[in-house]
């Protein structure tokens, strides 16, 4: 490895979405969180860690991060979490990052990989599956 390709110890990324973008196409695998395979909350957790930010493992825990924002104010880097339907204890929800005002980046079983998708399409699919309306969380000022 060339020295120019190494970051100093303790150096962190500044944009979790840029970290997630480098993982586009990585296969989705429930419970995974690596560059070889990841699930939705694992992608969020990896991206936050790369930026020096604490990130819990599960979507319902991630829904408590940062400050609540309205959908109309959502922007790049905001976290979105669709919480699981009542009584469904097989998973805790689905998490994603806003890529911009209209698109998300997430690891999804529907597409089988980390993908960029229109927010409206993802939202319609998760709501049709019984998930709650998503919460939007601003992680950084």
For the regions a protein language model found, what residue spans apply to each?
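Active-site nucleophilic cysteine motif
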Residues: 20, 34-51
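Boundary regions of SH3-family modules and the immediately adjacent low-complexity/disordered segments
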Residues: 1-22, 26
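Aromatic- and glycine-rich peptidoglycan recognition patches
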Residues: 4-8, 33, 93, 99-141
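...with weaker cross-activation on analogous glycine-rich loops/strands in unrelated enzymes
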Residues: 53-114, 119
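Second-shell loop/turn segments in exported
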Residues: 27-34
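Short hydrophobic alpha-helical module
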Residues: 23-26, 46-54, 83
């Amino acid at each position: 490895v060339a020295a120019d390709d190494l970051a100093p110890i303790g150096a962190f990324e500044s944009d979790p979405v840029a970290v997630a973008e480098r993982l586009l196409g990585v296969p989705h695998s429930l419970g995974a969180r690596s560059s070889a395979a990841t699930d939705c909350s694992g992608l969020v957790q990896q991206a936050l860690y790369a930026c020096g930010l604490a990130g819990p493992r599960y979507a319902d825990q991630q829904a408590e991060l940062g400050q609540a924002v309205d959908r109309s104010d959502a922007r790049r880097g905001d976290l979105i979490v669709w919480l699981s339907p009542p009584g469904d204890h097989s998973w805790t929800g689905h998490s994603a990052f806003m890529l911009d005002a209209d698109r998300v980046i997430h690891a999804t079983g529907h597409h089988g990989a980390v993908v960029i998708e229109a927010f409206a399409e993802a939202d319609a699919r998760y709501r049709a599956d019984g998930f709650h309306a998503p919460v939007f969380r601003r992680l950084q000022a």
